[in-house]
């Protein structure tokens, strides 16, 4: 999935203030899937979401789409070291259920996010988080892009899903 130079410049303009934030940079410290950091995973989801919206003319708000995709896993902990499943009562404390809430709290703490961005972050794990349903097209796009990226990253341990030529600091 290739984005044009113009599309990459658009993403850079939208996400510059978020990408430069020290807390966002901490996502580089944590592994998400395979050997892919949480930071790179979020970038992959941004690129795939943006590509889907542009190529299929889905009409999503590109700013909300990019910001929500970039912050959807802004949870800032190593989920591999969290306690494992130990009975039904601990089920909803597991990473898959709990991390959208952590990402939402961190995004609210660091940035003034919109209602669409809130919905994108809190519902990106749907249907696992069945009470948090995507209510806007941007959230549906990110939900699908996240699953696509997660499968590729987990199965193939690829650090670049959307574009194998993209540098770490490029969109």
Where are these regions (language model features)?
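Metal-dependent phosphohydrolase cores
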Residues: 1-171
């Amino acid at each position: 999935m290739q984005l044009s130079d113009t599309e990459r410049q658009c993403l850079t303009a939208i996400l510059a203030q978020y990408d430069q934030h020290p807390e966002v940079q901490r996502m580089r410290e944590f592994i998400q899937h395979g050997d892919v950091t949480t930071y790179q995973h979020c970038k992959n989801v941004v690129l795939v979401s943006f590509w889907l919206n542009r190529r299929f003319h889905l009409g999503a708000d590109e700013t909300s789409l990019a910001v929500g995709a970039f912050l959807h896993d802004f949870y800032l902990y190593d989920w591999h070291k969290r306690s494992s499943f130990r009975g039904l009562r601990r089920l909803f404390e597991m990473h898959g259920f709990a991390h959208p809430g952590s990402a939402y709290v961190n995004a609210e703490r660091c940035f003034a996010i919109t209602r669409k961005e809130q919905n994108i972050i809190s519902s990106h794990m749907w249907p696992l988080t069945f009470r948090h349903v995507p209510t806007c097209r941007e959230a549906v796009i990110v939900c699908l892009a996240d699953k696509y990226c997660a499968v590729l990253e987990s199965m193939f341990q690829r650090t670049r899903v959307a574009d194998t030529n993209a540098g770490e600091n490029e969109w």
